[in-house]
């Protein structure tokens, strides 16, 4: 090709950054304080709460149970440390409660999945529905792809009975999915399956082994342990000290262990002092933004989003622990 015309490069005009560093920092702190104030005003000393019962969104509360759960769900504390040989008192107590609960739930789940006459989804408890949803939608569809979403027929009567009408059990739904070839048996291992019964047995065996080591399933278990009060707020807050998330305060720590320090009051005090931030707890609301401009010139003086993050730790080799938090 021929060059029609060419212009030699030259230096362009100067570019000036109008952001005011101090104003940027102040705006970020102001957003954090404002969010903390909103969370504190809505925080309620109840473990479980259904916001759909409220007629107006302005009356919606934040159950403190959600705050306790956020320590585990958002990995502020590390649940993997609970079962170590050097675990501290609160960690040990929580782990013992958890292991017993997990064994009971896995046993009940497997019993229902093996039972052709298991209750319909709509007749299950709220907690058991959450486990069934996790198994079907999260584990089998999204995580493993064993249940192939692109093969499922949305207008199929049995699909509607499961997903919309909720009139059948997961046992019946999965067996039907096998008959319709919605199950990818290659994901179950190297075994050859000659019948629908063998495929279903393979699915159950896979589920049982997967759930034993599934940290996301463990988080769901902890959520309901906290909602029921089986794992207490005092135990969770004590673990914050045991794992060094906050500097050890012997008086407060021992008070949490022996019940003299109330976990709800503790959470409120840490939010008020911003030792715990809205961004860490990730309760609603937990994010905000602000743009400050000079009204005379239109220059942007501050442009802030909360919570902020260090993009250097999320590029090239990603810092996964930082990403999760």
How should each PLM-predicted stretch be described?
Residues 1-325:
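Periplasmic/cell-envelope proteins involved in peptidoglycan metabolism and beta-lactam response
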């Amino acid at each position: 090709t021929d060059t029609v015309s060419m212009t030699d490069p030259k230096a362009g005009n100067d570019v000036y950054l109008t952001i005011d560093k101090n104003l940027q920092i102040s705006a970020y702190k102001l957003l954090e304080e404002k969010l903390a104030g909103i969370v504190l005003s809505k925080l309620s000393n109840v473990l479980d709460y259904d916001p759909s019962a409220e007629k107006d969104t302005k009356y919606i509360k934040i159950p403190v149970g959600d705050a306790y759960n956020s320590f585990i769900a958002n990995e502020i504390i590390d649940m993997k440390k609970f079962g170590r040989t050097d675990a501290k008192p609160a960690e040990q107590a929580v782990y013992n409660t958890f292991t017993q609960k997990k064994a009971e739930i896995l046993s009940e789940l497997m019993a229902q999945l093996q039972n052709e006459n298991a209750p319909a989804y709509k007749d299950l408890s709220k907690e058991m529905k959450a486990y069934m949803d996790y198994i079907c939608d999260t584990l089998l569809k999204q995580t493993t792809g064993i249940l192939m979403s692109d093969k499922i027929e949305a207008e199929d009567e049995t699909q509607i009975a499961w997903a919309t009408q909720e009139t059948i059990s997961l046992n019946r739904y999965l067996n039907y999915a096998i008959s319709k070839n919605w199950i990818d048996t290659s994901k179950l291992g190297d075994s050859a399956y000659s019948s629908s019964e063998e495929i279903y047995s393979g699915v159950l065996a896979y589920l049982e082994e997967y759930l034993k080591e599934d940290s996301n399933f463990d988080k769901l278990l902890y959520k309901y342990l906290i909602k029921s009060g089986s794992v207490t707020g005092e135990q969770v807050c004590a673990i914050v000290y045991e794992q060094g998330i906050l500097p050890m305060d012997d008086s407060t720590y021992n008070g949490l262990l022996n019940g003299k320090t109330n976990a709800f009051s503790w959470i409120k005090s840490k939010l008020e002092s911003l030792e715990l931030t809205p961004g860490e707890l990730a309760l609603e609301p937990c994010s905000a933004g602000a743009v400050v401009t000079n009204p005379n010139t239109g220059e942007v003086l501050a442009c802030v989003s909360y919570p902020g993050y260090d993009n250097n730790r999320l590029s090239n080799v990603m810092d996964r622990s930082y990403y999760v938090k």
